């Protein structure tokens, strides 16, 4: 069985890990970094960049650079409009009210864009392992609903990965944290504040069993929001001074975003930071600069409401787990945003203990995913992971009431059946409206699917017996069936993401992604070849200066002619011509080297001017110093 890689598909950064023996290890990307920015960029020449190369060009190409796409996974456009309005790229409504990113004349779904990031992770792992990778465990925020989980699975399929398991980020973190503590029984709280989402989970660890007792969170709270309060402050300051809103200009907004993120990071270790953005925007034909000093105290004041929003989910998670604060043995911080000092202070104050510093908050989730991959392949034994669903699942019943079949924080996988009936006499069919949430009425919860069970024989109301079964798998993805117990007729539905992507669409996107993967590989090979040519030009010119006077006119002329050909091929970026010219230079140098070697051999033969007939009999005195034993 091949390796199953673990991928933390993050809002801001992504990370990939794999089991090596009994250890999970993070795999560095092609830039040598252990995490990869979750950013995709499209260039005017049709080239696509992912990760650090995409991030580096964002300021000059803001409308075609996509970041934080995870915030739109499995969402409806109408429910994410406020977030869409803050993006530098253009989001518009697609079919079924799904968000689509407009790039030139093409629309991309969040799944397609996430797949490009997953492809980068897949390629990173393949280059490290030296073989193709086909399977992965991918993490999601614990509070992701069914549609968001399904969308993540679709992204994996488009990227050419078989997603063996979707697991919750805090659970993955606890798995990585607790692997070397198998002999110790403990209750841990995982406080996970990432780039776009916040989760808190309470788990019991003991004898290799990792049991999630409860989970809670907010999928609209993360590091991006902390950046936004700085952006709004900077834009507000500039507007009050100059009368212009920088957020209306995509390039200026992108510069604000990068400056805000940098300032936030610096304030984790400094009391203040200077934000200096020269030539941010012309006002009345005059270039204007934005120079501001932001103190940590001011940042904490701006972010105060965001910080307080993390505490209610902590209270609810403890309540749902039936535990008091004093029963929590360890608090684990996950996600880059937990580096904010005020967050650490509030967590310590709430739980009454210092959070554990034993894990890297940027890497621990991917490590946990890799461990889960190891469990599935059998590389990791004696580990049992018991996760839960974050939100209740049920159906709409008479009067618009939401009737729960599977309660929140139920251990998965899980299966539950309940019998319902018709609401009117001789009702020929029933509509099963599947929902997810905690509110009493259907209209206040999230609709995740509908289907019909027809051909019900005529009968008075409440007589037909319709058995509805909810079956939720280990990925937290739901299958629903409805069966008329009288006739045995059954209808099933696998709840698909509200993305509305059909199997054909997913297959089409997967084929496109595969084609692009080949194109990306070719582009990379082309760049490497061009770099080799550049290096050979430099080395050849250097060697001609050094050894030119030792070469015969013929050999020197051959090298110079081949060098000229290589320069022309390099300028034209003609790979075939580069290969030919490089081969010609190598051949010419081989001939020249042979000539120089023969000349040197001839100079050292008997009969040379030195008149020596053998090794010299003379002895040269050298100084000798005995080394003291202590210095050895």
From Swiss-Prot:
InterPro entries: ATPase_NBD, Chaperone_DnaK, Heat_shock_70_CS, HSP70_C_sf, HSP70_peptide-bd_sf, Hsp_70_fam. Residues 601-614 have a biased composition (Low complexity). PROSITE patterns: HSP70_1, HSP70_2, HSP70_3. The modification Phosphothreonine is found at residue 197. Residues 595-632 are annotated as: Disordered. Induction: By stress conditions e.g. heat shock. GO terms for molecular function: ATP binding; ATP-dependent protein folding chaperone; unfolded protein binding. Disulfide bonds: none annotated. Residues 620-632 have a biased composition (Acidic residues). It comes from the Bacteria. Keywords: ATP-binding, Chaperone, Nucleotide-binding, Phosphoprotein, Stress response. PANTHER family: HEAT SHOCK PROTEIN 70KDA. Belongs to the heat shock protein 70 family. Acts as a chaperone. This is Chaperone protein DnaK. It comes from Cytophaga hutchinsonii (strain ATCC 33406 / DSM 1761 / CIP 103989 / NBRC 15051 / NCIMB 9469 / D465). The gene is dnaK.
